[in-house]
């Protein structure tokens, strides 16, 4: 008997699929469509096991849907712009384009052996001029639609990458790629008006029923809707033109506990004082050395500068509050000014304590007396409290009721108005780097800011650039930078900023519907293929990428590039777990960890016998060397083993631990399936009474595997296939029944292990390719179970089981039980004292 050889067979079946055009997406109005998409990768140069798991999940869905009669779109591309390519050019020489396209070629060569059902004819990279040229066309359309504008803004500046970062790209006060501390700088920036859609983006989350609740909650919190009061303090001692200080507060019920007012370092009043006071200028400069994100400001030490100015309380003009410039106030949220109530905000409490300001409680827990506070009392807004310095509503009420009453009262007294605000700010997209999509704008002394003429698109990046010094090479490239105005023909300058790379990934799903179209999308193709039916990717993209994509779909709908139905581009979202691995380390003479690759460790030791410390499984990391190269697994076991293992060991939303023993077990099972198929293909037994039982088992396998795949419970589908393999190997059914069951097995396992499935299908005489075979359907009549399995207990101990027809009389069941070998051994020739048959449940034998 020959042996299963994945290395020899997998490439052969991949060639057969390609030759038959099996995975080419076809616009077929006669068939329902299904669009499955995994978040496309950054071309770093190597795929990892996380990629394998992610793309295998999508592949399982795509293959099953195709078999079920859908016209499937399952594309792949590359999120190819970004700083790593520029960093590589600076560190190693060469050009970002060469580095990027070289990595794409390497990763494509690593992905193809996995046997993914991808329509490679639709492949593109976001750094292709054909792609970013269409992005530039959309930018111009968005300018005309009023969705793009330019203004001076305080931004997060990464001094190492020498570029602007969005707030979301600042992690712990540092740049998300460089790790450098971020500073604040004022620059002229391009913005998308995403904040115009804040309410709509928030409300529409409720329609995304097939998204994880966690992701919807994260987006809702990021959009951050709040209801509050906007009002003005009158000022005392302020410069001319600053007789009022506009404030926004979400807790107007605490107005009677106010002890100070504070403004952002970027507030117009602070800017005015900065120009006339050296001490203010020094303090503001210090504030700007902290990033602009809320996270950065929250973690920084709270500092303030007493301006000497005062504001008058709106309900008592004799009550004056000092005005501070504070480093924790954001200019682009609310009005850039607040009042502080230290008793009910921990940040304000720390600030007031530091600067010796009064702390006046407004409300207390029910049933308590006023005492000096050791910390701020900040109950949930839904909690009922006792207002001791309230001015609206009941004496005892919830915070929510207190806020609503305070807004109503203040409006009735002419003190401000109720306002709904959002944390979500407009999306600053300007980046001072080369390897990104050029912003298609010309600066003309006569005409001002002018969009490039569409017939001149794409505005291509120049190839002859140098990375000898930090900064944006486009600023130093006069033949590219200097141009003529498309409106008047005079000398002009190109915009040298490029777009945030999140723009590139915010519409790629739409481009896949017609990747060679001469416009961003083709209306007919977009109408057929959109929306993405199943989107798959990591939870780390819950806010940035997914929120930006939702905004872009709306912008594309407004500018005529997507149909109205695609306003929410992703019908269903699945966030998969990570692939983890143990960490192996020894320590050097100084006690520092030295990490080792898994292949260098055997039985907890290195090749020289040195024992290693084993750290429990963690996310695979190149720095900690707990990585497994998928190509090594494919060479050793075959692609199907890698696919089977990452799908079988854990629910897909959870992490899966990669182990060598697990991979070996998966490989052994697949070899067992091949041997079983080989044996059945040569069987010649006659039809018999067991055929019906095998047909019923096959029907159950079809039903449960289908349910598992369609419900994203891939591990349960695989568990059923294990069980079906055991059933088939033990069955005494006739040859034709077993061949029929084995062909069904090939169809059911095809989404997970497509190469082995083709081998089995061909071995058992299946017609054509199993990849093109229709998904099997279970006969409903065979799913009705007319038998029951009864456990047999002898003196309370389980001794076996018996399967009988459900309607069998108890007397007939007793005869079969007494004939059972295990029962006979227990009886030892004696008659039982009692034999009790509980219909449909159990048989008890008492001796």
UniProtKB/Swiss-Prot annotation:
Pfam families (alphabetical): Anticodon_1, tRNA-synt_1, tRNA-synt_1_2, tRNA-synt_1g
Sequence motif 'KMSKS' region, location on chain: 619-623
Motif ('HIGH' region): 41-51
EC number: 6.1.1.4
Keywords (A to Z) from UniProt: Aminoacyl-tRNA synthetase, ATP-binding, Cytoplasm, Ligase, Nucleotide-binding, Protein biosynthesis
Keyword flag Iron-sulfur: no
Residues noted as binding ATP in the record, renumbered to the chain: 622
Protein origin, superkingdom: Bacteria
Gene Ontology annotations of biological process type: leucyl-tRNA aminoacylation
InterPro entries referenced in this protein's UniProt entry, alphabetically: aa-tRNA-synth_I_CS, aa-tRNA-synth_Ia, Leu-tRNA-ligase, Leu_tRNA-synth_edit, M/V/L/I-tRNA-synth_anticd-bd, Methionyl/Leucyl_tRNA_Synth, Rossmann-like_a/b/a_fold, tRNAsynth_Ia_anticodon-bd
GO CC annotation terms, alphabetical: cytosol
One MF annotation (Gene Ontology) recorded for this entry: leucine-tRNA ligase activity
Any coiled-coil regions, as ranges: none
Reactions performed catalytically: tRNA(Leu) + L-leucine + ATP = L-leucyl-tRNA(Leu) + AMP + diphosphate
Cellular compartments annotated: Cytoplasm
CDD domains for this protein: Anticodon_Ia_Leu_BEm (cd07958), LeuRS_core (cd00812)
Similarity comment: Belongs to the class-I aminoacyl-tRNA synthetase family.
HAMAP family recorded: Leu_tRNA_synth_B (MF_00049_B)
NCBIfam families: leuS_bact
Descriptive protein name: Leucine--tRNA ligase
Source lineage: Bacteria, Pseudomonadati, Pseudomonadota, Alphaproteobacteria, Rhodobacterales
């Amino acid at each position: 008997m020959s042996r299963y050889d994945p290395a020899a067979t997998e490439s052969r079946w991949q060639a057969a699929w390609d030759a038959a055009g099996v995975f080419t997406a076809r616009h077929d109005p006669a068939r329902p469509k299904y669009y499955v998409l995994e978040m496309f990768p950054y071309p770093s140069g190597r795929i990892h096991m996380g990629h394998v798991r992610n793309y295998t999940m999508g592949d399982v869905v795509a293959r099953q849907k195709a078999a079920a009669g859908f016209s499937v779109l399952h594309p792949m591309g590359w999120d190819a712009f970004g700083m790593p390519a520029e960093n590589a050019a600076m560190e190693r020489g060469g050009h970002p384009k060469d580095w990027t396209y070289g990595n794409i070629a390497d990763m494509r060569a690593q992905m193809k052996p996995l046997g993914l059902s991808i329509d490679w004819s639709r492949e593109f990279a976001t750094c292709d001029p054909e792609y970013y040229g269409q992005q530039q066309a959309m930018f111009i359309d968005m300018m005309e639609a009023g969705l793009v504008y330019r203004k001076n803004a305080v931004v997060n500046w990464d001094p190492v990458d020498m570029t602007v970062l969005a707030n979301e790209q600042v992690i712990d006060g540092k740049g998300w790629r460089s790790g450098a501390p971020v500073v604040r700088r004022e620059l002229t920036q391009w913005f998308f008006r995403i904040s115009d859609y804040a309410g709509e983006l928030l409300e529409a989350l409720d329609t995304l029923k097939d998204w994880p609740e966690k992701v919807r909650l994260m987006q809702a919190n990021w959009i951050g809707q709040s209801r509050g009061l906007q009002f003005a303090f009158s000022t005392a001692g302020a410069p001319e033109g600053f007789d009022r200080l506009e404030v926004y507060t979400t807790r107007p019920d605490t107005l009677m506990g106010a002890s100070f007012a504070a403004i952002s370092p970027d507030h117009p009043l602070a800017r005015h004082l900065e120009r006339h006071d050296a001490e203010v200028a020094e303090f503001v400069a210090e504030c700007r050395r902290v990033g602009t994100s809320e996270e950065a400001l929250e973690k920084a030490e709270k500092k303030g500068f007493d301006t000497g100015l005062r504001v008058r309380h709106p309900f008592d003009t004799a009550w004056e509050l000092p005005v501070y410039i504070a480093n924790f106030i954001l200019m682009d949220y609310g009005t850039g000014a607040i009042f502080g109530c230290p008793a009910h905000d921990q940040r304000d409490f720390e600030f007031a304590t530091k600067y010796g300001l009064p702390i006046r409680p407004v409300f207390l827990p029910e049933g308590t007396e006023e005492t000096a506070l050791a910390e701020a009392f900040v109950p949930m807004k839904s909690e009922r409290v006792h207002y001791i310095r309230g001015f609206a509503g009941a004496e005892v009420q919830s915070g929510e009721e207190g806020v609503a009453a305070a807004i109503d009262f203040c409006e009735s007294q002419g003190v401000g108005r109720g306002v709904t605000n959002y944390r979500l700010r407009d999306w600053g997209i300007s980046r001072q780097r080369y390897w990104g999509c050029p912003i298609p704008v010309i600066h003309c002394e006569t005409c001002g800011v002018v969009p490039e003429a569409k017939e001149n698109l794409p505005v291509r990046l120049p190839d002859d650039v140098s990375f000898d010094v930090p900064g944006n090479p486009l600023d130093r490239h006069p033949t590219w930078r200097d141009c003529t105005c498309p409106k008047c023909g005079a000398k002009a300058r190109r915009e040298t900023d490029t777009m945030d790379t999140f723009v590139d990934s915010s519409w790629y799903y739409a481009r896949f519907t017609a990747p060679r179209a001469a416009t961003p999308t083709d209306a007919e193709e977009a109408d057929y293929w959109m929306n993405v039916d199943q989107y798959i990717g990591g939870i780390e993209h819950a806010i940035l990428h997914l929120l930006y994509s939702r905004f872009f779909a709306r912008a594309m709908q407004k500018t005529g590039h997507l149909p109205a139905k695609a306003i929410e581009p992703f019908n269903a979202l699945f966030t998969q777990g990570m692939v983890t691995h143990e960490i192996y380390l020894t320590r050097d003479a100084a006690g520092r960890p030295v990490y080792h690759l898994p292949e260098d460790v055997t039985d907890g030791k290195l090749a020289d016998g040195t024992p290693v410390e084993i750290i429990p499984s963690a996310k695979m990391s190149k720095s900690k060397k707990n990585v497994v190269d998928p190509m090594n697994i494919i060479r050793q076991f075959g692609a199907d083993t890698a696919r089977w293992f990452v799908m079988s060991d854990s629910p897909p939303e959870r992490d899966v631990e990669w182990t060598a023993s697990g991979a070996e077990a998966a490989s052994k099972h697949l070899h067992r399936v091949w041997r079983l198929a080989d044996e059945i293909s040569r069987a010649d037994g006659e039809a018999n009474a067991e055929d019906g039982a095998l047909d019923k088992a096959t029907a159950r396998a079809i039903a449960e595997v289908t349910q598992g795949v369609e419900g994203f419970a891939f591990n349960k589908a695989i568990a059923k296939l294990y069980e079906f393999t055991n059933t088939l190997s033990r069955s005494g059914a006739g040859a034709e029944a077993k061949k029929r069951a084995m062909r069904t097995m090939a169809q059911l396992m095809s989404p997970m292990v497509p190469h082995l499935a083709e081998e089995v299908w061909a071995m058992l005489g299946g017609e054509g390719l199993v990849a093109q075979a229709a998904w099997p359907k279970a006969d409903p009549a065979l799913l009705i179970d007319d038998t029951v399995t009864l456990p047999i207990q002898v003196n309370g101990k389980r001794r076996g089981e018996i399967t009988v027809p459900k309607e069998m009389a108890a007397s007939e069941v007793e005869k079969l039980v007494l004939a059972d070998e295990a029962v006979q051994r227990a009886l030892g020739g004696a008659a039982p004292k009692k034999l009790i048959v509980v219909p449909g449940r159990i048989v008890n034998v008492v001796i």
